[in-house]
From Swiss-Prot:
It is found in: Secreted. The keyword ATP-binding does not apply. GO terms for biological process: antibacterial humoral response; defense response to fungus; defense response to Gram-positive bacterium; innate immune response; killing of cells of another organism. Belongs to the cecropin family. The modification Leucine amide is found at L35. Cecropins have lytic and antibacterial activity against several Gram-positive and Gram-negative bacteria. Also has activity against fungi. This is Cecropin-A. GO terms for cellular component: extracellular region. Induction: By bacterial infection. It comes from Heliothis virescens (Tobacco budworm moth). InterPro entries: Cecropin.
Length: 35
């Protein structure tokens, strides 16, 4: 029962880390398109 919850928590953390790392790259791409 707890293993499933821990697994979901781990996946959520990975997604959040990915978004945090991707955000600057997305901003740079947006600025590049604006130019």
């Amino acid at each position: 029962r707890w293993k499933v919850f821990k697994k979901i928590e781990k996946v959520g953390r990975n997604i959040r880390d990915g978004v945090i790392k991707a955000a600057p790259a997305i901003e740079v791409l947006g600025q590049a398109k604006a130019l």
